[in-house]
Amino acid sequence: MNTQTPTVLDLVRQELRNFAGYSSARSVALTGDLWLNANESAWPNPADSHATMRRYPEPQPPKLRQMLAALYGCVPEQLLIGRGSDEGIDLLVRAVCEPGCDPVLVTPPVFGMYAVSAQLQNAPVIQVPLVDDAAGFHADVPAIITAAQTSRAKLVFLCSPSNPVGAAIPLQQIETILQTLAGTALVVVDEAYGEFSDVPSVVPLLARYPHLVVLRTLSKAHALAAVRIGSVIADAHLVAILRRCQAPYPLPTPCVSLAEQGLSAAALQVTAQRVAEIRAERERLGAALACLSGVRRVYPSQGNFLLVRFDDAEAALQALYAAGVVVRDQRAAPQLHDALRLTVGTPEQNTRLLAVLRDIQAVPA
């Protein structure tokens, strides 16, 4: 009889639980003033004026890891830095799902990379659609729990705030899912848009639920999308496994440097001011859109975007394109046959967007 208490590592693929991964030249802390261990060039490239790029970078830069952990409210050992949230999603699927066997649960309409990563791993995808009612879109928590249990899903992805619909999941509902699926699935909460939300982060719940995983990114509120810095926040043992599954040198030195500068106290103060402005503009833009005759519905949003249904989404889309305004066409997504997603821009950009849509109304049919 096995009386050993289950751990989060029991959810990892068995062959990876003791997987050592690749041991790179930077995997072990070494000291010395003459480094001849990684077959790097002895001279900098002529384009490298500061002579800082000839060495391989730190796999997990300690300073940046500490800054991100402080930002998100965890300890560094609970945080893995990756190339955007996309890499975190991919690592989780590869580490947890046995190909052709272990399902991944998603809640469409939702960010497509969860299903894409699952399909690349040949993991079955279980879909539990969001419910669209008078209050907007929301997660069907009882259906999520039932589907996860019935299918024996190993990963449950919850996007909160959800892209593209903008809805956030209340903490109490996430905790209900965590309580019910303890020991059977990792519950992954994607908080890419968390800075714009009224709902607090779920990171503090990690102390009680080691099967919780949180995804964060510097791409949205922190305006560093090109830098490609995302974080997986999870049980330290799981983070160690994911690191072994990760590429040896995932983080380019220039990206790390920009991220560290972007997380300085001064930069964080500017970011907070901009987030507040986006939240205010989100309300202004939403109210103005709702007054347009061609707009069928503007959904409440906890992100930096608005999902909008149009009487004629094609006409709205083409008018915006003709005016040089690019928005996201969502009509191929489940339940969104008439919807466009509009990013909240600066006040001037939002006013320009509204002017184009108002002009459509002025054109005789």
UniProtKB/Swiss-Prot annotation:
Highest taxon above the source species: Bacteria
InterPro entries, sorted: Aminotransferase_I/II_large, HisP_aminotrans, PyrdxlP-dep_Trfase, PyrdxlP-dep_Trfase_major, PyrdxlP-dep_Trfase_small
Associated pathway: Amino-acid biosynthesis; L-histidine biosynthesis; L-histidine from 5-phospho-alpha-D-ribose 1-diphosphate: step 7/9
Known cofactor(s): pyridoxal 5'-phosphate
A single BP term in Gene Ontology: L-histidine biosynthetic process
A GO MF term: histidinol-phosphate transaminase activity
Coiled-coil positions: none
Claim: Hydrolase is one of the keywords in the record: no
Top-level enzyme category: transferase
Keywords annotated in UniProt: Amino-acid biosynthesis, Aminotransferase, Histidine biosynthesis, Pyridoxal phosphate, Transferase
Residues recorded with modification N6-(pyridoxal phosphate)lysine: K220
EC number(s) stated in the UniProt entry for this protein: 2.6.1.9
Catalytic activity: L-histidinol phosphate + 2-oxoglutarate = 3-(imidazol-4-yl)-2-oxopropyl phosphate + L-glutamate
HAMAP family named in the record: HisC_aminotrans_2
Family stated for the protein in its record: Belongs to the class-II pyridoxal-phosphate-dependent aminotransferase family. Histidinol-phosphate aminotransferase subfamily.
Subunit structure: Homodimer.
Protein name from the UniProt record: Histidinol-phosphate aminotransferase
